[in-house]
Design a protein with these regions (language model features):
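Amphipathic alpha-helical packing segments from all-alpha helical-bundle domains
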Residues: 103-139, 162-174
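Short, hydrophobic secondary-structure boundary micro-motifs
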Residues: 30, 96-99, 107, 153, ...
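Amphipathic alpha-helical linker/stalk segments
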Residues: 61-80, 109-113, 118-124
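Helical hydrophobic small-molecule/effector-binding pocket
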Residues: 78-100, 104-112, 141
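C-terminal peripheral helix-coil segments that are non-catalytic and often amphipathic
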Residues: 120-124, 153-237
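Amphipathic, non-transmembrane alpha-helical scaffold segments
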Residues: 6, 56, 60, 64, ...
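Helix-turn-helix
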Residues: 12, 16-54
Length: 237
């Protein structure tokens, strides 16, 4: 009896690869592990993908397309920044794959839809052509990507995660506003407002509720650690 093709198989394989990446990075992503996690056989995976890097390339391409689709629904540059952060934090494993060396991160010499979308929005707001704003967009992207990776990889803990997300959006909008008011003039850069440094942004649209749960867990763990330290200090006394 002929076997019926599974139209969802390739997506299951990519989802499995993403989960495995989240557990242990590239070293945990073997063809056999992908097959087991996807609920299929290793030969079946090889029928669709040559090797691990081929799977990662496919996952990377899909993630780029999904990020672009998410950004196209935004009405303003500020919303684009917010959505970029939200996407990176909601799809953290896929986002890490997108910029990992194994999968070769995008460069200015290959199509990068999301980067080009930002440049087009900058051209609409500031004038000129998208290419004119490549340098500015590199600075803005560095801000967004750096913030996302610091949060994803746990370099920022507790309430600092939320403050960093707000500060990133504030900084993004401040830089764009400074470029808008000074276009055609030479300037030394935007002057940073006090609320940016203090992390008092009011961007209520930013969906960072999923970070608050981890913040509470971190506070609980810090409290336990503090209690242990205090008990040890008391005992030594």
């Amino acid at each position: 009896m002929p076997r019926h093709p599974d139209p969802q198989l390739e997506q299951r394989i990519l989802d499995a690869a993403c989960r495995l990446w989240g557990r242990g990075g590239a070293k945990s992503l073997t063809m056999r592990a992908v097959a087991k996690t996807a609920g299929t056989t290793t030969p079946t995976v090889y029928e669709r993908y040559r090797d691990r890097d081929d799977i990662l390339r496919a996952l990377r391409q899909q993630t780029r397309q999904e990020l672009f689709a998410a950004l196209t629904r935004c009405q303003s540059l500020g919303q684009c920044c917010e959505r970029y952060l939200e996407f990176a934090l909601e799809r953290s494993h896929a986002y890490e794959v997108l910029f990992d060396g194994v999968a070769q991160p995008p460069s200015l010499h290959e199509p990068w839809p999301s980067f080009n979308l930002f440049r087009e929005r900058l051209a609409q707001q500031l004038g000129g052509t998208p290419r004119d704003h490549t340098r500015l967009m590199l600075a803005l992207w560095s801000l967004m990507h750096g913030t996302a990776m610091l949060i994803i990889r746990g370099r920022a803990t507790g309430a600092l995660r939320i403050q960093m997300a707000y500060a990133c959006v504030d900084a993004f909008e401040t830089i764009v506003a400074a470029a808008s008011t000074s276009k055609g003039k030479r300037h030394s850069g935007p002057k940073w407002p006090a609320n940016l440094i203090l992390g008092e942004g009011q961007h209520s649209r930013l969906n960072i509720h999923h970070m608050k749960g981890k913040e509470k867990r971190d506070q609980g763990e810090n409290g336990k650690a503090g209690g242990k330290t205090e008990r040890k200090t008391t005992a030594r006394r």
